[in-house]
Regions:
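Active-site-proximal polar cores
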Residues: 1-26
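Short, conserved turn/kink motifs that form compact alpha/beta structural patches or helix kinks used as
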Residues: 21-123
Length: 123
């Protein structure tokens, strides 16, 4: 296995994905699922920015194309915060959300996350 691949895999970080579903016209979220992905901070245009910010407003994730059915606009994530021990069906403390439809290309995909307003990190 190439050195490059090993590095990529090692850099993946853990986060929890909560898929959105609608019940009686209201948004709810499935139980958090632990996944491992790479993500990088960007500006609102999706251009990479330096890692200076602790809690970036936007993150770009490039999952494997085989994972394309996992991600949907409106899904929420716990990234810099842990999910609660008892599942919260509205994920009110989830710190990020997919804010536009994931872009799917032939052999890659891109998912844009936006920090949810009103959610603060501890520090």
């Amino acid at each position: 296995m190439g050195h490059h691949l090993r590095n990529l895999r090692r850099n993946k970080r853990k986060l929890y994905l909560c898929q959105k579903y609608i019940e009686n016209g209201k948004d709810f979220f499935q139980e958090p699922v632990l996944i491992h992905e790479n993500y990088l901070p960007t500006n609102s245009e999706g251009d990479l920015i330096s890692i200076g910010m602790d809690y970036p407003m936007y993150l770009r994730m490039k999952p494997e194309i085989s994972e394309k059915d996992l991600f949907h606009e409106g899904d929420r994530f716990y990234i810099f915060v842990e999910p609660p021990t008892v599942h919260d069906k509205i994920c009110k403390n989830a710190d990020y959300e997919i804010y536009k439809k994931p872009m799917i290309h032939i052999d890659s995909m891109e998912v844009m996350l936006k920090r949810r307003s009103g959610v603060r990190s501890d520090n």
